[in-house]
Amino acid sequence: MNIKEKQFESDIEQYLIKYGGYTKDDQSNYDRDKAIDMTKLIEYIQKTQSKEWKRYQRVYGSDAQNKIYKRFNESVEMHGLLYILRNGFDDRGIRIKVASFKPETTLNQEVIDKYNANILTCTRQFKYSTENENSIDIVLSLNGIPIVALELKNQLTGQDVNNAKKQFMYDRNPRELCFNFNKRFLVYFCVDLYEIYMTTELRGKDTFFLPFNQGSNGAGNVGGAGNPENKDGYTTSYLWEKVLQKDVLMDILQRYMTVAIDEKINKKTGKKKISKKLIFPRYHQLDVVTKLIEDVKTNGSGKNYLIQHSAGSGKSNSIAWLAYGLANLHKNNEKIFKSVVVVTDRTVLDSQLQDTIYGFDHTDGVVEKIDGKKTSKDLRDAINNGKKIIITTLQKFPYIYDEIDDNTNKNFAIIVDEAHSSQSGNNAKKLKPALADTTDSLKEFAEIEGKEESEIKDSEDILVQELLTQGYHKNLSFFAFTATPKEKTLEMF
């Protein structure tokens, strides 16, 4: 591929403007001191919140724009940019939103119009500094707020992603407002012709980069590091052709990015140290969750999915993102699942899941945790009351399957962590009866009776009931995550 100087940069910009939902920006109204383009933010607010803006002007008069910035910046300092993008901020009883996200349904045209009013811009050679004329190759902004930075390198000119990493580490001062953690930029990408790395926080020489590659054989396929060759363009084009597309990026901001909080006690002083980390999904996580949700959207409930997700690859976050996505999934403006039940034996996952999901949705009652302090009746009530996401242990499930309400025409998604441990034994056999729509005929299960009989040592009556739960149920979808699937697990799925 013949790539001249700046052509790489130009090709990415042109694609994003032509296909990605962005407009070209020249930074003419960008304020380096404030690290924002206030004209675009005000334009967005006027388009989407005209009543609030008029009230704001009545309160502050000609100083309204300065006051908006002041309150925005104070709110970002207090809560972080990610939270403000999702929730907006209040001033004198006026709620101001700085971004709009895609609605679950197409029923409310006003909400759709607000989403379409978002102003996404692409700027080349973005000059950010108040001290010099240094520039970032490409910056993507949302309603005037810079959120994505790309440093591009080209092997044909003797540089690669490692040079981009060094640039972020040594040439970008983290004390600049735009580089402050969770204040403006939320993710930084190092991109060359063959590989991509990313980080969510600049910490000078201590900046830590994660690979954002697909794997040598493509996402979801067994292979080594790196990316598969792309015969139709750049090997790394999946970044701007998929991930940075308006709908995908906005979805990541709304449903994926999260702030992980880690608390550690100093054994000597007894003082608590709290550290925060911004999580941006790695490519394999984004890929698997997106594929699962799209398949359910296309085929509805009733399918089983086995996901091989290796240890240390962010499985807890993948499960949390999937749970949140499934809980809000609609088809033809109808909600697909009544509840999403996450089954795990690991208490640490419970807290991680809760924290991650609470970061997306602060509505009370969205997540119900059925831990050791609660009874199986609490679990049954949570299911029958239609709690969106229920986190429980496998041990709780067997006690309720014959008490649960008639679930005909009610769909459930069951996410199982470590499929081979949670799907074996009598507890798992009773997991399906608790939620299955058992109005289907017994006959379709007769052929597997022999195979199942060798595995189940319960009485014949229990065997019949449990056999009824095996196989296809149109109201039950299983999503099993495992690092090392066993033979029995592979057979089941």
What label would you give each PLM region?
Residues 157-161, 169, 200-201, 208-212, ...:
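Signature of the SF2 helicase/ATPase Hel1-core->accessory helical subdomain module
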Residues 2-339, 348, 352-363, 395, ...:
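ATP-dependent helicase/translocase motor core
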Residues 344-351, 383:
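AAA+/P-loop NTPase substrate/partner-engagement loops
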Residues 347, 369-378, 394-399:
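Conserved helicase motor
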Residues 373-390, 406:
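Conserved motor-coupling elements within RecA-like helicase/translocase cores
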Residues 189-190, 390-393, 476-482:
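Structural recognition of the conserved hydrophobic beta-strand(s) that form the central parallel beta-sheet
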